Curated annotation (Swiss-Prot):
Lineage, uppermost ranks: Viruses, Adnaviria, Zilligvirae, Taleaviricota, Tokiviricetes
InterPro entries, alphabetized: SIFV_Orf14
Domain of life: Viruses
Protein's UniProt name: Uncharacterized protein 75
Pfam family, one: DUF1374
Length: 75
């Protein structure tokens, strides 16, 4: 997890984890809520979210999920 500094204009949070099963839309929503719970921000800031998935080696039968959030502070 990346650390943020008070004076930065753009902040990025990246959460990466591996699970051995696919998740549905409701579970995606829970992952986003988890990411936001780690990312405190004023409501007028701009937030962008990207979720990436990557299949790992066949013998692992797992997916790597990455949630990225970018916060741009409004002045």
């Amino acid at each position: 997890m990346d650390l943020f500094f008070e004076d930065s204009i753009i902040q990025e949070l990246s959460l990466k984890f591996k699970i051995s099963f696919e998740i549905n839309e409701e579970e995606y929503q829970q992952l986003i809520e988890l990411a936001f719970s780690q990312f405190i921000y004023p409501s007028n800031d701009n937030i962008e979210i990207k979720i990436n998935t990557k299949e790992l080696a066949d013998n692992e039968k797992a997916l790597l999920y990455e949630i990225q959030l970018w916060r741009t502070k409004k002045s």
